[in-house]
Amino acid sequence: MLDTSIQALINKWQKYLVLQRNYSNHTVISYNNDLKHFLEFMNYYNSELVTINHIKTADIRLIRSWLAKRNCDNFTASSISRGLSAVKNFYRFLEKTTQLNSHIIFSIKSPKKTKLLPKALSEDDVVISLEHIEEYGNVKWIELRNKALLVLIYASGLRISEALSITKLHLQNLEFIRIIGKGSKERIIPWLPIAKNLITQYLEILPYKLGDNEPIFRGKQGKKLQPPVFNRELIKLKHFYGLPQHLTAHSFRHSFASHLLEHGADLRSLQELLGHKSLSTTQSYTKTSIKHLEAVYTTAYPIKK
Protein backbone atom coordinates (compact mmCIF):
# COMPACT_ATOMS: atom_id res chain seq x y z
CA MET A 1 0.00 0.00 0.00
CA LEU A 2 1.51 3.32 -1.07
CA ASP A 3 0.60 6.92 -0.38
CA THR A 4 -1.19 8.36 -3.45
CA SER A 5 1.34 11.19 -3.80
CA ILE A 6 4.20 8.67 -3.91
CA GLN A 7 2.36 6.53 -6.47
CA ALA A 8 1.92 9.65 -8.61
CA LEU A 9 5.68 10.28 -8.41
CA ILE A 10 6.39 6.68 -9.40
CA ASN A 11 4.08 7.02 -12.41
CA LYS A 12 5.91 10.18 -13.52
CA TRP A 13 9.26 8.44 -13.01
CA GLN A 14 8.18 5.52 -15.21
CA LYS A 15 7.10 7.89 -18.00
CA TYR A 16 10.44 9.69 -17.70
CA LEU A 17 12.34 6.39 -18.08
CA VAL A 18 10.40 5.47 -21.22
CA LEU A 19 10.07 8.84 -22.95
CA GLN A 20 13.30 10.59 -22.00
CA ARG A 21 15.73 7.80 -21.15
CA ASN A 22 14.47 5.34 -23.79
CA TYR A 23 14.39 2.43 -21.32
CA SER A 24 12.72 -0.78 -22.50
CA ASN A 25 9.40 -1.87 -20.99
CA HIS A 26 11.19 -4.86 -19.47
CA THR A 27 13.68 -2.61 -17.63
CA VAL A 28 10.96 -0.24 -16.44
CA ILE A 29 8.91 -3.13 -15.03
CA SER A 30 11.98 -4.55 -13.26
CA TYR A 31 12.92 -1.14 -11.83
CA ASN A 32 9.34 -0.56 -10.66
CA ASN A 33 9.28 -3.93 -8.86
CA ASP A 34 12.62 -3.19 -7.18
CA LEU A 35 11.49 0.26 -6.02
CA LYS A 36 8.23 -1.12 -4.62
CA HIS A 37 10.19 -3.78 -2.74
CA PHE A 38 12.32 -0.99 -1.23
CA LEU A 39 9.27 1.08 -0.24
CA GLU A 40 7.52 -1.94 1.27
CA PHE A 41 10.62 -2.57 3.37
CA MET A 42 10.59 1.10 4.40
CA ASN A 43 6.95 0.66 5.50
CA TYR A 44 8.01 -2.26 7.69
CA TYR A 45 11.14 -0.49 8.96
CA ASN A 46 9.26 2.66 10.02
CA SER A 47 6.11 0.81 11.16
CA GLU A 48 3.97 3.31 9.27
CA LEU A 49 2.84 4.23 5.77
CA VAL A 50 5.74 5.73 3.84
CA THR A 51 5.52 9.41 2.95
CA ILE A 52 7.71 11.54 0.70
CA ASN A 53 9.45 12.79 3.85
CA HIS A 54 10.42 9.21 4.78
CA ILE A 55 11.95 8.79 1.33
CA LYS A 56 13.89 12.04 1.53
CA THR A 57 15.26 11.31 5.01
CA ALA A 58 16.05 7.59 4.56
CA ASP A 59 19.40 6.96 6.25
CA ILE A 60 22.24 4.61 5.45
CA ARG A 61 21.16 2.07 8.10
CA LEU A 62 17.75 1.64 6.45
CA ILE A 63 19.26 1.21 2.99
CA ARG A 64 21.89 -1.27 4.17
CA SER A 65 19.22 -3.19 6.10
CA TRP A 66 17.17 -3.45 2.91
CA LEU A 67 20.18 -4.75 0.96
CA ALA A 68 20.92 -7.25 3.75
CA LYS A 69 17.29 -8.42 3.66
CA ARG A 70 17.55 -9.07 -0.07
CA ASN A 71 20.74 -11.02 0.50
CA CYS A 72 19.05 -13.14 3.21
CA ASP A 73 16.15 -13.74 0.80
CA ASN A 74 18.68 -15.32 -1.61
CA PHE A 75 18.60 -12.59 -4.24
CA THR A 76 21.64 -12.89 -6.51
CA ALA A 77 24.34 -10.22 -6.42
CA SER A 78 23.14 -9.16 -9.86
CA SER A 79 19.54 -8.72 -8.64
CA ILE A 80 20.67 -6.82 -5.54
CA SER A 81 22.83 -4.56 -7.69
CA ARG A 82 19.97 -3.93 -10.12
CA GLY A 83 17.63 -3.15 -7.20
CA LEU A 84 20.05 -0.58 -5.81
CA SER A 85 20.43 0.94 -9.29
CA ALA A 86 16.65 1.22 -9.58
CA VAL A 87 16.31 3.01 -6.24
CA LYS A 88 19.24 5.32 -7.06
CA ASN A 89 17.58 6.09 -10.38
CA PHE A 90 14.37 7.07 -8.57
CA TYR A 91 16.31 9.33 -6.20
CA ARG A 92 18.04 11.02 -9.16
CA PHE A 93 14.60 11.64 -10.63
CA LEU A 94 13.50 13.19 -7.32
CA GLU A 95 16.57 15.46 -7.45
CA LYS A 96 15.45 16.70 -10.85
CA THR A 97 11.79 17.20 -9.99
CA THR A 98 11.56 18.02 -6.24
CA GLN A 99 13.52 19.82 -3.54
CA LEU A 100 15.56 16.70 -2.72
CA ASN A 101 19.26 17.44 -2.36
CA SER A 102 22.12 15.00 -2.82
CA HIS A 103 21.24 11.82 -0.91
CA ILE A 104 23.37 9.36 1.07
CA ILE A 105 22.18 6.52 -1.21
CA PHE A 106 24.55 7.68 -3.95
CA SER A 107 27.55 6.85 -1.73
CA ILE A 108 26.56 3.18 -1.45
CA LYS A 109 28.40 0.88 -3.84
CA SER A 110 26.73 -2.04 -5.53
CA PRO A 111 27.83 -5.56 -4.54
CA LYS A 112 30.33 -7.14 -6.89
CA LYS A 113 28.58 -9.26 -9.47
CA THR A 114 29.87 -12.62 -10.57
CA LYS A 115 30.80 -12.18 -14.19
CA LEU A 116 29.06 -14.84 -16.22
CA LEU A 117 30.32 -15.51 -19.70
CA PRO A 118 27.70 -15.13 -22.45
CA LYS A 119 26.27 -18.53 -23.36
CA ALA A 120 26.22 -19.09 -27.09
CA LEU A 121 24.72 -22.01 -28.98
CA SER A 122 26.75 -24.25 -31.25
CA GLU A 123 26.35 -23.65 -34.97
CA ASP A 124 24.61 -27.03 -35.25
CA ASP A 125 22.06 -26.03 -32.58
CA VAL A 126 21.40 -22.76 -34.40
CA VAL A 127 20.80 -24.62 -37.67
CA ILE A 128 18.39 -27.05 -35.97
CA SER A 129 16.52 -24.14 -34.39
CA LEU A 130 16.20 -22.17 -37.62
CA GLU A 131 15.08 -25.25 -39.56
CA HIS A 132 12.39 -26.30 -37.08
CA ILE A 133 11.06 -23.12 -35.44
CA GLU A 134 8.29 -22.99 -38.09
CA GLU A 135 6.79 -26.16 -36.60
CA TYR A 136 5.40 -24.13 -33.69
CA GLY A 137 2.57 -21.67 -34.14
CA ASN A 138 -0.42 -23.64 -35.57
CA VAL A 139 -1.18 -20.80 -37.99
CA LYS A 140 0.93 -20.19 -41.10
CA TRP A 141 1.56 -16.49 -40.49
CA ILE A 142 2.67 -17.16 -36.89
CA GLU A 143 4.98 -19.96 -38.04
CA LEU A 144 6.56 -17.62 -40.59
CA ARG A 145 6.71 -14.82 -38.00
CA ASN A 146 8.66 -17.06 -35.63
CA LYS A 147 11.19 -18.01 -38.29
CA ALA A 148 11.58 -14.44 -39.59
CA LEU A 149 12.14 -13.11 -36.06
CA LEU A 150 14.66 -15.79 -35.10
CA VAL A 151 16.62 -15.39 -38.33
CA LEU A 152 16.61 -11.61 -37.86
CA ILE A 153 18.09 -11.87 -34.34
CA TYR A 154 20.77 -14.35 -35.36
CA ALA A 155 21.58 -12.56 -38.63
CA SER A 156 21.89 -9.11 -37.05
CA GLY A 157 22.69 -9.63 -33.36
CA LEU A 158 19.71 -7.55 -32.26
CA ARG A 159 18.39 -7.64 -28.72
CA ILE A 160 14.91 -9.18 -28.61
CA SER A 161 13.45 -5.78 -27.61
CA GLU A 162 15.15 -4.17 -30.63
CA ALA A 163 13.95 -6.86 -33.03
CA LEU A 164 10.37 -6.50 -31.77
CA SER A 165 10.54 -2.76 -32.43
CA ILE A 166 11.29 -3.15 -36.15
CA THR A 167 8.72 -1.30 -38.30
CA LYS A 168 7.93 -1.08 -42.01
CA LEU A 169 10.10 2.03 -42.17
CA HIS A 170 13.13 -0.11 -41.35
CA LEU A 171 12.41 -2.19 -44.44
CA GLN A 172 12.57 0.76 -46.82
CA ASN A 173 16.36 0.87 -46.81
CA LEU A 174 17.70 -1.97 -48.94
CA GLU A 175 21.17 -2.10 -47.39
CA PHE A 176 21.03 -1.55 -43.64
CA ILE A 177 18.89 -1.25 -40.48
CA ARG A 178 19.25 1.83 -38.30
CA ILE A 179 18.72 0.80 -34.66
CA ILE A 180 18.33 2.95 -31.56
CA GLY A 181 19.51 0.71 -28.73
CA LYS A 182 20.30 1.02 -25.03
CA GLY A 183 21.04 4.53 -23.83
CA SER A 184 19.69 5.93 -27.13
CA LYS A 185 22.88 4.69 -28.84
CA GLU A 186 22.40 4.47 -32.60
CA ARG A 187 24.02 1.80 -34.71
CA ILE A 188 23.77 0.65 -38.31
CA ILE A 189 23.53 -3.04 -39.17
CA PRO A 190 23.65 -4.53 -42.69
CA TRP A 191 20.50 -6.24 -43.91
CA LEU A 192 21.05 -9.89 -44.77
CA PRO A 193 18.81 -10.87 -47.72
CA ILE A 194 17.56 -14.04 -45.98
CA ALA A 195 16.23 -12.01 -43.03
CA LYS A 196 14.61 -9.35 -45.17
CA ASN A 197 13.05 -11.91 -47.54
CA LEU A 198 11.50 -13.86 -44.66
CA ILE A 199 10.09 -10.67 -43.14
CA THR A 200 8.62 -9.69 -46.52
CA GLN A 201 6.97 -13.12 -46.87
CA TYR A 202 5.60 -12.85 -43.33
CA LEU A 203 4.13 -9.39 -43.95
CA GLU A 204 2.43 -10.63 -47.14
CA ILE A 205 0.28 -13.07 -45.13
CA LEU A 206 -0.02 -11.11 -41.85
CA PRO A 207 -3.79 -10.73 -41.27
CA TYR A 208 -3.46 -7.26 -39.71
CA LYS A 209 -2.96 -3.92 -41.44
CA LEU A 210 -0.08 -1.91 -40.00
CA GLY A 211 1.03 1.69 -40.29
CA ASP A 212 4.61 2.45 -41.30
CA ASN A 213 5.61 3.25 -37.72
CA GLU A 214 4.00 0.22 -36.07
CA PRO A 215 6.12 -2.77 -34.98
CA ILE A 216 5.71 -5.54 -37.54
CA PHE A 217 5.91 -8.57 -35.25
CA ARG A 218 2.41 -9.17 -33.86
CA GLY A 219 0.77 -11.58 -31.43
CA LYS A 220 -2.33 -13.69 -32.11
CA GLN A 221 -4.68 -10.81 -31.27
CA GLY A 222 -2.80 -8.31 -33.42
CA LYS A 223 -1.00 -6.55 -30.58
CA LYS A 224 2.76 -6.02 -30.50
CA LEU A 225 4.52 -9.33 -29.81
CA GLN A 226 6.13 -9.48 -26.36
CA PRO A 227 9.43 -11.27 -25.51
CA PRO A 228 7.91 -13.84 -23.08
CA VAL A 229 5.45 -14.98 -25.77
CA PHE A 230 8.23 -15.63 -28.27
CA ASN A 231 10.43 -17.32 -25.67
CA ARG A 232 7.58 -19.74 -24.93
CA GLU A 233 7.74 -20.81 -28.58
CA LEU A 234 11.47 -21.42 -28.13
CA ILE A 235 10.85 -23.50 -24.99
CA LYS A 236 8.68 -25.89 -27.06
CA LEU A 237 11.43 -26.13 -29.67
CA LYS A 238 14.11 -26.68 -27.01
CA HIS A 239 12.24 -29.48 -25.26
CA PHE A 240 11.24 -31.36 -28.41
CA TYR A 241 14.71 -31.35 -30.00
CA GLY A 242 16.75 -31.66 -26.81
CA LEU A 243 18.47 -28.31 -27.32
CA PRO A 244 20.54 -26.60 -24.57
CA GLN A 245 18.75 -25.24 -21.50
CA HIS A 246 20.17 -21.75 -22.06
CA LEU A 247 18.44 -21.45 -25.46
CA THR A 248 16.43 -18.20 -25.42
CA ALA A 249 15.93 -15.39 -27.90
CA HIS A 250 18.91 -13.60 -26.31
CA SER A 251 21.16 -16.64 -26.76
CA PHE A 252 20.91 -16.12 -30.54
CA ARG A 253 22.39 -12.63 -30.09
CA HIS A 254 25.24 -14.22 -28.11
CA SER A 255 25.62 -16.84 -30.84
CA PHE A 256 25.78 -14.13 -33.53
CA ALA A 257 28.70 -12.54 -31.68
CA SER A 258 30.57 -15.74 -30.81
CA HIS A 259 30.25 -17.24 -34.29
CA LEU A 260 31.46 -14.04 -35.96
CA LEU A 261 34.53 -14.05 -33.70
CA GLU A 262 35.20 -17.70 -34.43
CA HIS A 263 35.10 -16.88 -38.15
CA GLY A 264 37.56 -13.99 -37.91
CA ALA A 265 35.57 -10.84 -37.08
CA ASP A 266 37.49 -8.15 -35.18
CA LEU A 267 36.38 -6.85 -31.78
CA ARG A 268 35.86 -3.22 -32.81
CA SER A 269 33.51 -4.15 -35.64
CA LEU A 270 31.65 -6.53 -33.34
CA GLN A 271 31.33 -3.80 -30.71
CA GLU A 272 29.63 -1.56 -33.29
CA LEU A 273 27.29 -4.32 -34.46
CA LEU A 274 26.24 -5.23 -30.92
CA GLY A 275 25.87 -1.62 -29.78
CA HIS A 276 28.13 -2.04 -26.75
CA LYS A 277 29.21 1.20 -25.10
CA SER A 278 32.37 -0.40 -23.73
CA LEU A 279 34.80 -2.65 -25.58
CA SER A 280 35.28 -4.63 -22.35
CA THR A 281 31.69 -5.88 -22.68
CA THR A 282 32.44 -7.16 -26.18
CA GLN A 283 35.67 -8.76 -24.98
CA SER A 284 33.68 -11.21 -22.85
CA TYR A 285 32.90 -13.00 -26.12
CA THR A 286 36.60 -13.65 -26.72
CA LYS A 287 36.66 -15.71 -23.51
CA THR A 288 33.70 -17.72 -24.80
CA SER A 289 35.52 -18.30 -28.10
CA ILE A 290 38.70 -19.37 -26.27
CA LYS A 291 36.68 -21.88 -24.24
CA HIS A 292 35.22 -23.18 -27.51
CA LEU A 293 38.72 -23.59 -28.96
CA GLU A 294 39.92 -25.34 -25.79
CA ALA A 295 37.03 -27.81 -26.06
CA VAL A 296 37.81 -28.51 -29.72
CA TYR A 297 41.52 -28.88 -28.91
CA THR A 298 40.89 -31.27 -26.01
CA THR A 299 38.51 -33.40 -28.06
CA ALA A 300 40.30 -33.46 -31.40
CA TYR A 301 44.02 -33.07 -30.76
CA PRO A 302 45.71 -36.40 -31.61
CA ILE A 303 48.38 -36.33 -28.86
CA LYS A 304 46.73 -36.90 -25.50
CA LYS A 305 48.21 -37.71 -22.11
Curated annotation (Swiss-Prot):
Compartments it resides in: Cytoplasm
Cellular component GO terms held in the UniProt record: cytoplasm
Domain Tyr recombinase: 116-298
Xref: Gene3D superfamilies: 1.10.150.130, Intergrase catalytic core (1.10.443.10)
GO biological process: cell division; chromosome segregation; DNA transposition
Any Pfam family hit: Phage_integrase
Subunit structure: Forms a cyclic heterotetrameric complex composed of two molecules of XerC and two molecules of XerD.
Stated family: Belongs to the 'phage' integrase family. XerC subfamily.
Protein name per its UniProtKB record: Tyrosine recombinase XerC
Gene name per UniProt: xerC
